[in-house]
Amino acid sequence: MISLTKHNELKGYKSLDVYPEVAHFVTTRHEGISTGAYGSFNCSPYTNDSCMNVNRNQSWLFQCMNHQIKELFIPEQSHGCASLIINESFFKESLEMRRLLLRGMDALITNVPGYCVCVTTADCVPVLLYDKKQHVVAAVHAGWKGTVKHIVSNVMDHLNKMFGTQGEDVIACIGPSISLESFEVGDEVYDAFEESGFDMSLISMKKKETGKYHIDLWEANRIELPVSYTHLRA
């Protein structure tokens, strides 16, 4: 990853940075005004953080961007596999209806310039997609539950059906998230991945010391992408 700001508050990817028509970023915890559990750069409205803090953090984010951002859209995620297209039909809705439409979404898609689609993650995997031919972007929240439900491949299918996206035209970036070494799971989670059709020899290991399984969410989502290694960045 590369730094997009002087003090590393925002991170990014070389593979996306070469496309001046698209803005992207990965935030860190630093440089915001939130405190306590939300310290300090919390931009999510779906927390107990104050609206003032969230708005000021988002304003600072806009100032850091090299693009003119009209509005930031963050879904109220549910660890599912539903996605929403942010388009002219969405903009025609009332503010209350927009909030309702964002509820339960774990991926946002848009091809409308000036609008930023986001997801929020901690351990879960953020996946950024850019179709450099159709000029469509997507932000995907792939927690283990969403990964089991094949959220990334579902979003790719959605992009193909709605915009004609082809895998070879997509830049895919996997963001900071829990590693194979750290993601210890119980048998029920292991079984959920196996029952969902994943080749467990590719995405899991069993530690001799603990007898516990570990799952590689990065690899699980990578193999869901019809994208070559040359287009994929983690």
Model-derived regions: residue spans:
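Active-site microenvironment for binding and transforming phosphate-containing groups
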Residues: 1-232
